[in-house]
Amino acid sequence: MNHEYNPYENAVAVIRKAAEALGLHENDYAFLLYPERELKVSLPVVMDSGKTEVFEGFRVQHSSVLGPCKGGIRYHADTNIDEVKALACWMALKCSVAGIPYGGGKGGIRVDPSRLSSRELEALTRKYAHAIAPIIGEKKDIPAPDVNTNGQIMAWFCDAYSETVGSFSPAVVTGKPLEIGGSLGRTDATGRGVMLTVRELLSRYGKKASEMRVAVQGNGNVGGTTVKLLGELGCKVVAVSDVSGALLCDDGLDCDEIYRYSAEHKLLRDFDKSAGTFIAGADGNAALLVCDTDILIPAALENQITGENAKKIKAKYIVEAANG
């Protein structure tokens, strides 16, 4: 992540620019420039080694004007309060634009979850749920999965929160497993929305899916589902990336095989090398953004398209699946 870039300052600048274009006085939108509440918590966890590590967690509630705050929880080594504030702000704007009666919230823990065992991950999640329990709830703030979090983590979170309040409270989070009240289709929903956006784009511009070369940055819940569904749509997916790097193939990748492989939580760096050219790490993700493609889909972290690489992008269309 570019440490010189402050995502919250960027979010505020965009609001100011939009307000100026609309001719609004700052009195009309000043409340949108600051979060209602931001919480930082320390999360001590006894690791499998016996050593205690203390992790930093965050929960930000940007606005509850339209209803309870809504927004995911991400686990990432680079997560910080400014990133979480920006994401909460964007959630408030998205819910408002979509006409959904929710406000904007976001949470995160500064951690590389790939370093943690399942037991350590559960312990960290439970600590976090207990720590932020006083400010969340089905009528106050409802978390959900985000980067590096999933239904299992939501189940642990829900259980820990329920312990804290003294009753089973499944409505405290969305993105839960079906067995405890989750929604059928929720896991694929965002990626399916991306696919439908691409389908509408093709219809509007009179393009055939089979003629479209697509690059997808990100192979998690959003990116992985997008790759699978675009393959079913008939698009030629020529590049996919994850945190380990990018896999590129001019002839097109086997979308179903990549989806099955990734569903087992395996990284692309270990995928069949005969499938294409693998470029490791940040270099791979940078190469994907400027590869020869018709449609580029950023579906990972924010701030990937910058002033430095924007002019190098060859894609005719960019479908925005990431947060910022």
Which role does the model predict for each range below?
Residues 1-184:
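N-terminal ligand-binding/catalytic initiation module
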Residues 2-6, 201-202, 316-324:
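Adenosine-phosphate binding glycine-rich loop
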Residues 114, 152-154, 221-232, 310:
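Short glycine/threonine-rich loop-to-helix capping motif typified by GTGT followed
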Residues 136-138, 207-211, 291-293, 310-317:
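Short, surface-exposed connector motifs at secondary-structure boundaries
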Residues 163, 199-207, 299-302, 324:
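Conserved helix-loop functional segments at active or binding sites
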Residues 182-290:
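Glycine-rich phosphate/diphosphate-binding loop of Rossmann-like nucleotide-binding domains
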Residues 295-324:
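ADP-ribose/adenylate-binding Rossmann-like module
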